[in-house]
Amino acid sequence: MLQFTPPLQPATLILRYKRFLADIVTPAGEALTIHCANTGAMTGCATPGDTIWYSTSDNPKRKYPQSWELTQTQTGDWICVNTMRANELVNLAIEKNQIAELSGYNFVRKEVKYGEENSRIDLLLQAEDRRDCYIEVKSVTLLQQQCGYFPDAVTLRGQKHLRELQNRVVNGHRAVLFFAVLHTGIKQVAPARHIDRRYAELLVQAQQAGVEVICYGFQLSPDGIELNTRLPLLQDEMLSSENAE
C-alpha cells in the first residue's frame, strides 16, 4: 500500500481553476488555495461541494504547500486526482510482485529516454532472460455511463506515446500501456473515441501491432492506495463506435 504520511486532511472544494489551483475550505472554516497536480479536464472529479483530501509538503520553497490528492464524490466514489501518483503506484506494485503480467524482471528503471520522438518511458523493466519491457502508465478517472474512459481531453502527448510503444514492438521489445484506474466507480475501461478519436484509432493500431494493454483498479482511502483487481478493456466499445460512424 502507498500510505499517506502525514495523514491527509479533509476540506470542501469551492473551485478548481487555472488547471493547477483549487480553492477549498477546511472544517475549521479556513480558506486555502492548494496545488492540483492534474492537467486534464477532471470531468466529474472537481464538483464544487465535494469533499477533497489534501497532503501538506514540508518544502518551505513551495508557494502552495498543500496538494489535492483525493476526491470523495457526493455519490460516494473515491478518486485520486493527483496523476503523479499513478507511476508511483504501478512501480510499487511491480516491486512487490503484485502484477502477475509484469513479474519476473530484475530491474526497474524510471523516466528513461527512448524512441524516435524524444520521449521518456515511465517504467522500463529488464532481465537477462527476457526482452526489455517498456511501460507507459495512464491514470483513468473519467466515469461516464458506468465505464471509465481515457483520455478525458485531447492528448497529443498520449498519441505520441502510443506511436512510441508500437515502435518498441517493431524493434523487438515488449511494450505495455497500463491503465491505472483511480476511480472506485469504474469497473471497465474504454478509449474515449468521443473525446479524442485519433487516440482511439492509434490504440487499436498499437494493439494490432502487439502492444499489450493492462487495466487495474485500486482501493482508495485517506489512509492510502492499494492495487485491487484487473479490469476489462472494452474492445467492442471501440468497434461499435467505429461502425456507428
Curated annotation (Swiss-Prot):
Source taxon at top rank: Bacteria
Record-level Gene Ontology MF annotations: DNA binding
Listed InterPro entries: SfsA, SfsA_C, SfsA_N
PANTHER family: SUGAR FERMENTATION STIMULATION PROTEIN A
Family to which the UniProt record says this protein belongs: Belongs to the SfsA family.
Protein name: Sugar fermentation stimulation protein homolog
Gene: sfsA
